[in-house]
């Protein structure tokens, strides 16, 4: 069983049952261990306690990691990130090295004092626990190295795009983006790739379709942030956090992205990167497939506007979106189309065109 924030595994039940049984046996035979040259009973109590604390810290880290999703505000994510740094520092710099050293010490004590154990069964139990300890420590090391190599591979792919990488940056990324978020992002990217394979209009648009889509993109409201919204604190395309003064473009589904990011995205895929809703649900690309682009700039503009008027059903912008962002943003451009949309009307480029202008 594995739940985000709990992460209770099957071996936790095995460990707890083994711990309870061993503690009872050691407590019953406590005085008999004094005949041994080395205090094996103290060793096993300390080892059990340390492993138990180690697992508790893992539970705490998993709980902190569950609060690092994009659905949470930047302040909460920063607090969870700092908490993970502290917890993981205790695990990796204190408890994990101590368990290695303590296990080696226990092995040496056991080889020199195994004949003094009260019962034969305890000798085998002690040996099994040592083997379990070594296997667990090695598994933790291999799992961590594997996760680090996986993240490093992702950063190497980014380096091909000119983004600088560092080993420290990979470590910070592993803490800031927990495993569940990393896997969810991978699934989302695979879903986007599948969508792109079946619907990737940017590669197949005719010039007339391209002009119409570009005109629709430019009609989307554009703002400059004067405050960062808690529920949408970063651009999902470039994964950079929003800051005051950033220029963003708002979609009808009330999701914000950097202007340059979303413009490039919509030229290839007219679905919202976050919720997968169609940004232009009334756009009929098939109706534009036979239109030809004119050779002059003036004729291209008239042709694009006419195409929009003919093949897009006029609908008012979603008022809920503007109400939501009104306190956070102010417009970069206050052209007539945007002002009309903010007032609940229809942009004139979509309504005032007559057939005579074609």
From Swiss-Prot:
It catalyses: S-ubiquitinyl-[E2 ubiquitin-conjugating enzyme]-L-cysteine + [acceptor protein]-L-lysine = [E2 ubiquitin-conjugating enzyme]-L-cysteine + N(6)-ubiquitinyl-[acceptor protein]-L-lysine. Expressed in roots, stems, leaves, flowers and siliques. Disruption phenotype: Resistance to high concentrations of exogenous glucose and sucrose on early seedling development. SUPFAM superfamilies: RING/U-box. It is a multi-pass membrane protein. GO terms for molecular function: ubiquitin-protein transferase activity; zinc ion binding. It is found in: Membrane. One of its GO terms (cellular component) is membrane. Pfam families: zf-RING_2. Gene3D superfamilies: Zinc/RING finger domain, C3HC4 (zinc finger) (3.30.40.10). Residues 336-358 are annotated as: Disordered. Its main location: membrane. One of its GO terms (biological process) is protein ubiquitination. The chain crosses the membrane at residues 40-60, 85-105, 125-145. A zinc finger (RING-type) spans 235-276. Pathway: Protein modification; protein ubiquitination. Keywords: Membrane, Metal-binding, Signal, Transferase, Transmembrane, Transmembrane helix, Ubl conjugation pathway, Zinc, Zinc-finger. Residues 1-27 form the signal peptide. Its EC number is 2.3.2.27. E3 ubiquitin protein ligase that acts as a positive regulator of sugar signaling during early seedling development. Possesses E3 ligase activity in vitro. PANTHER family: E3 UBIQUITIN-PROTEIN LIGASE SIS3. This is E3 ubiquitin-protein ligase SIS3.
